[in-house]
Amino acid sequence: MNTRFLDACWGKPVDRTPVWLMRQAGRYLPDYMRVRSKCTFLELCKTPELAAEVSIQPVDILGVDAAILFSDILTPVEPMGMALDFVPGPVFEHPIRTMADVEKLRIPQMEQDVPYVLETIKILRRELANKVPLIGFGGAPFTLACYMVEGKGSKDWATMKRMMYAAPEVYAALMEKVTMMDMEYLNAQIKAGAQAIQIFDTWGGVLAPSDYEKYVLPYTTKLINGLNRQNVPVIHFVKGAGTMLDSVKRAGGDVMGLDWHINLGKAREVLGDMAVQGNLDPTVLFAPKDVIEQEVKRVLDENAGKPGHIFNLGHGILPTVPPENAIHMVECVHRLSQK
Protein backbone atom coordinates (compact mmCIF):
# COMPACT_ATOMS: atom_id res chain seq x y z
CA MET A 1 0.00 0.00 0.00
CA ASN A 2 1.07 3.59 -0.66
CA THR A 3 1.80 4.88 2.87
CA ARG A 4 3.11 8.36 1.94
CA PHE A 5 0.03 10.11 3.32
CA LEU A 6 0.16 8.35 6.71
CA ASP A 7 3.93 8.77 6.94
CA ALA A 8 3.58 12.51 6.31
CA CYS A 9 0.85 12.78 8.97
CA TRP A 10 3.39 11.46 11.49
CA GLY A 11 6.15 13.76 10.21
CA LYS A 12 8.18 10.91 8.72
CA PRO A 13 10.30 11.49 5.59
CA VAL A 14 8.67 10.52 2.27
CA ASP A 15 10.05 10.11 -1.25
CA ARG A 16 7.57 12.69 -2.59
CA THR A 17 4.85 14.89 -1.10
CA PRO A 18 1.49 13.10 -0.75
CA VAL A 19 -1.59 14.86 -2.09
CA TRP A 20 -5.36 14.53 -1.87
CA LEU A 21 -8.17 17.08 -2.33
CA MET A 22 -11.01 18.08 -0.08
CA ARG A 23 -14.27 17.18 -1.89
CA GLN A 24 -12.22 15.08 -4.32
CA ALA A 25 -15.26 12.85 -4.86
CA GLY A 26 -17.57 15.44 -6.35
CA ARG A 27 -19.38 17.21 -9.13
CA TYR A 28 -16.30 18.19 -11.16
CA LEU A 29 -15.89 14.50 -12.12
CA PRO A 30 -18.16 13.18 -14.92
CA ASP A 31 -17.96 9.70 -13.36
CA TYR A 32 -19.37 11.11 -10.12
CA MET A 33 -22.20 12.86 -11.97
CA ARG A 34 -23.08 9.61 -13.73
CA VAL A 35 -23.65 7.96 -10.34
CA ARG A 36 -25.28 11.04 -8.80
CA SER A 37 -27.79 11.34 -11.68
CA LYS A 38 -29.46 8.13 -10.51
CA CYS A 39 -30.22 9.22 -6.94
CA THR A 40 -30.52 12.15 -4.54
CA PHE A 41 -27.51 13.35 -2.56
CA LEU A 42 -28.82 11.75 0.65
CA GLU A 43 -29.53 8.47 -1.16
CA LEU A 44 -25.95 8.48 -2.42
CA CYS A 45 -24.64 9.03 1.12
CA LYS A 46 -26.87 6.23 2.46
CA THR A 47 -26.11 3.59 -0.19
CA PRO A 48 -22.75 2.02 0.77
CA GLU A 49 -21.95 0.49 -2.64
CA LEU A 50 -22.49 3.83 -4.41
CA ALA A 51 -20.75 5.91 -1.71
CA ALA A 52 -17.76 3.57 -1.92
CA GLU A 53 -17.73 3.76 -5.73
CA VAL A 54 -17.52 7.56 -5.77
CA SER A 55 -14.94 7.56 -2.94
CA ILE A 56 -12.61 5.42 -5.07
CA GLN A 57 -13.06 7.39 -8.32
CA PRO A 58 -10.51 10.15 -7.54
CA VAL A 59 -7.91 7.57 -6.47
CA ASP A 60 -8.11 5.95 -9.90
CA ILE A 61 -8.67 9.12 -11.95
CA LEU A 62 -6.41 11.67 -10.22
CA GLY A 63 -3.77 9.42 -8.69
CA VAL A 64 -4.14 10.91 -5.19
CA ASP A 65 -2.37 9.37 -2.18
CA ALA A 66 -5.46 8.94 0.03
CA ALA A 67 -9.18 8.30 -0.30
CA ILE A 68 -11.75 10.06 1.85
CA LEU A 69 -15.11 8.62 2.82
CA PHE A 70 -17.96 10.05 0.75
CA SER A 71 -20.57 11.39 3.16
CA ASP A 72 -21.73 14.71 4.61
CA ILE A 73 -20.77 16.32 7.92
CA LEU A 74 -24.47 16.51 8.90
CA THR A 75 -25.09 12.77 8.44
CA PRO A 76 -24.92 11.95 12.19
CA VAL A 77 -26.99 15.00 13.16
CA GLU A 78 -30.15 13.71 11.48
CA PRO A 79 -30.54 10.71 13.85
CA MET A 80 -30.21 13.07 16.83
CA GLY A 81 -33.82 13.92 15.98
CA MET A 82 -33.39 16.66 13.37
CA ALA A 83 -35.12 16.20 10.01
CA LEU A 84 -32.59 17.05 7.29
CA ASP A 85 -33.08 17.88 3.63
CA PHE A 86 -30.86 19.28 0.86
CA VAL A 87 -32.63 21.92 -1.28
CA PRO A 88 -29.86 22.19 -2.59
CA GLY A 89 -27.98 23.23 0.58
CA PRO A 90 -28.65 21.59 3.97
CA VAL A 91 -31.88 22.63 5.71
CA PHE A 92 -33.14 21.53 9.14
CA GLU A 93 -36.91 21.77 9.51
CA HIS A 94 -36.81 22.60 13.23
CA PRO A 95 -33.63 24.50 14.27
CA ILE A 96 -32.37 24.43 17.87
CA ARG A 97 -33.32 27.61 19.71
CA THR A 98 -34.15 26.71 23.34
CA MET A 99 -32.97 24.46 26.17
CA ALA A 100 -36.06 22.31 25.55
CA ASP A 101 -34.88 21.80 21.97
CA VAL A 102 -31.45 20.71 23.21
CA GLU A 103 -32.96 18.31 25.75
CA LYS A 104 -34.94 16.55 23.00
CA LEU A 105 -31.76 15.67 21.10
CA ARG A 106 -30.59 12.09 21.46
CA ILE A 107 -27.10 10.62 21.09
CA PRO A 108 -27.44 8.15 18.19
CA GLN A 109 -26.38 4.52 18.42
CA MET A 110 -24.02 4.64 15.47
CA GLU A 111 -24.21 0.98 14.42
CA GLN A 112 -28.01 1.18 14.40
CA ASP A 113 -28.50 4.78 13.22
CA VAL A 114 -25.77 5.27 10.59
CA PRO A 115 -24.89 1.69 9.57
CA TYR A 116 -24.47 2.82 5.96
CA VAL A 117 -21.47 5.02 6.90
CA LEU A 118 -19.73 2.16 8.69
CA GLU A 119 -20.52 -0.30 5.88
CA THR A 120 -19.10 2.16 3.32
CA ILE A 121 -15.85 2.27 5.33
CA LYS A 122 -15.67 -1.54 5.44
CA ILE A 123 -16.22 -1.80 1.67
CA LEU A 124 -13.57 0.86 1.05
CA ARG A 125 -10.99 -0.86 3.24
CA ARG A 126 -11.46 -4.03 1.18
CA GLU A 127 -11.37 -2.20 -2.16
CA LEU A 128 -8.40 0.01 -1.22
CA ALA A 129 -6.36 -2.69 0.52
CA ASN A 130 -3.40 -2.50 -1.86
CA LYS A 131 -3.87 1.11 -2.94
CA VAL A 132 -4.06 4.02 -0.50
CA PRO A 133 -5.22 4.77 3.08
CA LEU A 134 -8.80 5.78 3.90
CA ILE A 135 -9.64 9.04 5.68
CA GLY A 136 -12.82 9.21 7.76
CA PHE A 137 -14.21 12.58 8.78
CA GLY A 138 -16.71 14.60 10.73
CA GLY A 139 -17.67 18.19 11.34
CA ALA A 140 -16.26 19.93 14.40
CA PRO A 141 -18.83 20.53 17.17
CA PHE A 142 -19.03 24.28 16.48
CA THR A 143 -19.63 23.91 12.74
CA LEU A 144 -22.29 21.23 13.29
CA ALA A 145 -23.99 23.39 15.93
CA CYS A 146 -23.97 26.37 13.53
CA TYR A 147 -26.18 24.46 11.08
CA MET A 148 -28.37 23.07 13.87
CA VAL A 149 -29.07 26.54 15.30
CA GLU A 150 -29.39 28.50 12.05
CA GLY A 151 -31.31 25.69 10.33
CA LYS A 152 -29.36 26.29 7.11
CA GLY A 153 -26.21 27.95 5.79
CA SER A 154 -25.56 31.60 6.66
CA LYS A 155 -23.23 34.45 5.75
CA ASP A 156 -22.83 35.76 9.30
CA TRP A 157 -24.17 32.99 11.62
CA ALA A 158 -25.90 35.72 13.63
CA THR A 159 -28.45 33.37 15.24
CA MET A 160 -25.67 31.09 16.45
CA LYS A 161 -23.63 34.00 17.78
CA ARG A 162 -26.70 35.45 19.50
CA MET A 163 -27.19 32.16 21.36
CA MET A 164 -23.49 32.08 22.25
CA TYR A 165 -23.60 35.55 23.81
CA ALA A 166 -27.18 35.84 25.09
CA ALA A 167 -28.00 32.25 26.09
CA PRO A 168 -24.63 30.76 27.07
CA GLU A 169 -26.22 27.96 29.09
CA VAL A 170 -28.20 26.76 26.04
CA TYR A 171 -25.08 27.06 23.87
CA ALA A 172 -22.99 25.06 26.36
CA ALA A 173 -25.62 22.32 26.67
CA LEU A 174 -25.88 22.02 22.89
CA MET A 175 -22.11 21.95 22.40
CA GLU A 176 -21.68 19.27 25.08
CA LYS A 177 -24.27 17.06 23.40
CA VAL A 178 -22.89 17.59 19.90
CA THR A 179 -19.35 16.88 21.14
CA MET A 180 -20.44 13.58 22.70
CA MET A 181 -22.26 12.60 19.50
CA ASP A 182 -19.23 13.55 17.39
CA MET A 183 -16.93 11.48 19.59
CA GLU A 184 -19.16 8.41 19.23
CA TYR A 185 -19.42 8.94 15.47
CA LEU A 186 -15.69 9.32 14.80
CA ASN A 187 -14.79 6.44 17.11
CA ALA A 188 -17.28 4.27 15.21
CA GLN A 189 -15.52 5.24 11.97
CA ILE A 190 -12.14 4.31 13.47
CA LYS A 191 -13.53 0.98 14.69
CA ALA A 192 -14.92 0.30 11.19
CA GLY A 193 -11.47 0.85 9.69
CA ALA A 194 -10.81 4.56 9.02
CA GLN A 195 -7.01 5.02 8.98
CA ALA A 196 -7.03 8.79 9.58
CA ILE A 197 -9.68 11.29 10.69
CA GLN A 198 -10.21 14.83 9.44
CA ILE A 199 -12.24 17.23 11.58
CA PHE A 200 -13.78 20.01 9.49
CA ASP A 201 -14.39 23.26 11.38
CA THR A 202 -15.55 25.20 8.35
CA TRP A 203 -17.04 28.04 10.39
CA GLY A 204 -14.59 28.24 13.33
CA GLY A 205 -12.85 31.14 11.62
CA VAL A 206 -15.93 33.39 11.71
CA LEU A 207 -15.20 34.12 15.39
CA ALA A 208 -12.80 36.57 16.98
CA PRO A 209 -9.73 34.75 18.34
CA SER A 210 -10.84 35.36 21.94
CA ASP A 211 -14.29 33.92 21.21
CA TYR A 212 -12.73 30.88 19.51
CA GLU A 213 -10.68 30.29 22.67
CA LYS A 214 -13.72 30.60 24.94
CA TYR A 215 -16.55 29.07 22.93
CA VAL A 216 -14.96 26.52 20.57
CA LEU A 217 -11.54 25.33 21.70
CA PRO A 218 -12.71 23.48 24.87
CA TYR A 219 -15.15 21.34 22.89
CA THR A 220 -12.83 20.51 19.99
CA THR A 221 -10.11 19.63 22.52
CA LYS A 222 -12.52 17.34 24.37
CA LEU A 223 -13.50 15.69 21.08
CA ILE A 224 -9.92 15.03 19.96
CA ASN A 225 -8.89 13.80 23.42
CA GLY A 226 -11.83 11.36 23.36
CA LEU A 227 -10.87 9.65 20.10
CA ASN A 228 -9.43 6.13 20.13
CA ARG A 229 -6.60 7.28 17.94
CA GLN A 230 -3.78 4.78 18.39
CA ASN A 231 -2.01 4.92 15.02
CA VAL A 232 -4.88 7.02 13.58
CA PRO A 233 -3.71 10.59 12.88
CA VAL A 234 -6.19 13.44 13.35
CA ILE A 235 -6.21 16.33 10.85
CA HIS A 236 -7.81 19.49 12.26
CA PHE A 237 -8.97 21.94 9.60
CA VAL A 238 -10.35 25.32 10.71
CA LYS A 239 -11.15 27.53 7.73
CA GLY A 240 -10.03 31.11 8.37
CA ALA A 241 -7.81 30.21 11.32
CA GLY A 242 -4.67 31.99 10.13
CA THR A 243 -4.74 34.52 12.99
CA MET A 244 -5.24 31.91 15.73
CA LEU A 245 -3.10 28.92 14.78
CA ASP A 246 -1.55 28.84 18.25
CA SER A 247 -5.03 28.31 19.76
CA VAL A 248 -6.07 25.72 17.17
CA LYS A 249 -2.83 23.80 17.76
CA ARG A 250 -3.75 23.43 21.44
CA ALA A 251 -6.80 21.36 20.47
CA GLY A 252 -4.34 18.50 20.07
CA GLY A 253 -4.57 17.24 16.48
CA ASP A 254 -1.63 15.64 14.69
CA VAL A 255 -1.93 17.62 11.44
CA MET A 256 -3.03 21.24 10.93
CA GLY A 257 -5.16 21.82 7.85
CA LEU A 258 -4.47 25.27 6.37
CA ASP A 259 -6.57 27.40 4.04
CA TRP A 260 -4.94 29.60 1.38
CA HIS A 261 -5.06 32.85 3.38
CA ILE A 262 -1.80 32.14 5.17
CA ASN A 263 1.73 31.54 3.92
CA LEU A 264 2.59 27.92 4.67
CA GLY A 265 6.10 28.84 5.81
CA LYS A 266 4.74 31.47 8.24
CA ALA A 267 2.28 28.89 9.60
CA ARG A 268 5.20 26.53 10.17
CA GLU A 269 6.87 29.19 12.35
CA VAL A 270 3.86 29.11 14.69
CA LEU A 271 3.25 25.36 14.54
CA GLY A 272 6.82 24.13 14.96
CA ASP A 273 7.18 20.43 14.11
CA MET A 274 3.43 19.83 13.72
CA ALA A 275 2.54 18.33 10.33
CA VAL A 276 0.58 20.59 7.97
CA GLN A 277 -1.89 20.06 5.14
CA GLY A 278 -2.62 22.51 2.34
CA ASN A 279 -2.87 25.06 1.01
CA LEU A 280 -3.41 25.94 -2.66
CA ASP A 281 -6.21 28.40 -3.48
CA PRO A 282 -8.95 26.19 -5.06
CA THR A 283 -9.51 28.72 -7.87
CA VAL A 284 -5.95 28.15 -9.14
CA LEU A 285 -7.37 25.02 -10.78
CA PHE A 286 -9.14 27.27 -13.32
CA ALA A 287 -5.76 28.66 -14.46
CA PRO A 288 -3.66 27.52 -17.45
CA LYS A 289 -1.53 24.47 -16.72
CA ASP A 290 1.74 26.41 -16.55
CA VAL A 291 0.22 28.69 -13.87
CA ILE A 292 -1.03 25.66 -11.92
CA GLU A 293 2.52 24.29 -11.97
CA GLN A 294 3.95 27.64 -10.78
CA GLU A 295 1.47 27.78 -7.89
CA VAL A 296 2.12 24.17 -6.88
CA LYS A 297 5.85 24.96 -6.84
CA ARG A 298 5.22 28.07 -4.71
CA VAL A 299 3.39 26.05 -2.04
CA LEU A 300 6.07 23.36 -2.06
CA ASP A 301 8.78 26.05 -1.80
CA GLU A 302 7.00 27.64 1.18
CA ASN A 303 7.25 24.29 2.95
CA ALA A 304 11.00 24.29 2.15
CA GLY A 305 11.29 20.50 2.00
CA LYS A 306 10.36 19.96 5.66
CA PRO A 307 8.84 16.57 6.54
CA GLY A 308 5.19 16.42 7.54
CA HIS A 309 3.55 18.17 4.57
CA ILE A 310 0.43 16.85 2.83
CA PHE A 311 -0.47 18.85 -0.27
CA ASN A 312 -4.13 19.84 -0.55
CA LEU A 313 -6.32 22.72 -1.56
CA GLY A 314 -7.14 25.37 1.03
CA HIS A 315 -10.81 24.29 0.83
CA GLY A 316 -12.94 21.97 -1.28
CA ILE A 317 -12.42 21.59 -5.03
CA LEU A 318 -15.00 23.66 -6.93
CA PRO A 319 -17.68 21.87 -9.00
CA THR A 320 -16.76 23.50 -12.32
CA VAL A 321 -13.01 22.73 -12.25
CA PRO A 322 -11.87 20.83 -15.38
CA PRO A 323 -10.86 17.32 -14.21
CA GLU A 324 -7.71 17.43 -16.35
CA ASN A 325 -6.51 20.43 -14.31
CA ALA A 326 -6.90 18.48 -11.06
CA ILE A 327 -5.00 15.56 -12.63
CA HIS A 328 -2.27 17.99 -13.72
CA MET A 329 -2.02 19.46 -10.21
CA VAL A 330 -1.51 16.00 -8.66
CA GLU A 331 1.11 15.15 -11.28
CA CYS A 332 2.93 18.45 -10.59
CA VAL A 333 2.99 17.82 -6.83
CA HIS A 334 4.48 14.37 -7.32
CA ARG A 335 7.01 15.42 -9.95
CA LEU A 336 8.20 18.64 -8.30
CA SER A 337 8.57 17.09 -4.83
CA GLN A 338 10.29 13.86 -5.91
CA LYS A 339 13.36 13.29 -3.74
Swiss-Prot record:
GO term, biological process aspect, one: protoporphyrinogen IX biosynthetic process
Keywords, alphabetical: Cytoplasm, Decarboxylase, Lyase, Porphyrin biosynthesis
Protein's organism: Geotalea uraniireducens (strain Rf4) (Geobacter uraniireducens)
Oligomeric and partner information: Homodimer.
Reported function: Catalyzes the decarboxylation of four acetate groups of uroporphyrinogen-III to yield coproporphyrinogen-III.
EC number: 4.1.1.37
InterPro entries recorded: UROD/MetE-like_sf, Uroporphyrinogen_deCO2ase_HemE, Uroporphyrinogen_deCOase
Organism domain of life: Bacteria
SUPFAM superfamilies: UROD/MetE-like
Site entry: Transition state stabilizer: 72
Top-rank EC class of the record's enzyme: lyase
PROSITE patterns for the chain: UROD_1 (PS00906), UROD_2 (PS00907)
Family statement: Belongs to the uroporphyrinogen decarboxylase family.
UniProt key word Protein biosynthesis: no
UniProt-recorded name of the protein: Uroporphyrinogen decarboxylase
NCBIfam families, per the entry: hemE
Pfam families: URO-D
Cellular component aspect of the GO annotation: cytoplasm
Coiled coil: none
Pathway: Porphyrin-containing compound metabolism; protoporphyrin-IX biosynthesis; coproporphyrinogen-III from 5-aminolevulinate: step 4/4
Catalytic activity: uroporphyrinogen III + 4 H(+) = coproporphyrinogen III + 4 CO2
Keyword Lipid biosynthesis found: no
Binding locations of substrate: 23-27, 72, 147, 202, 315
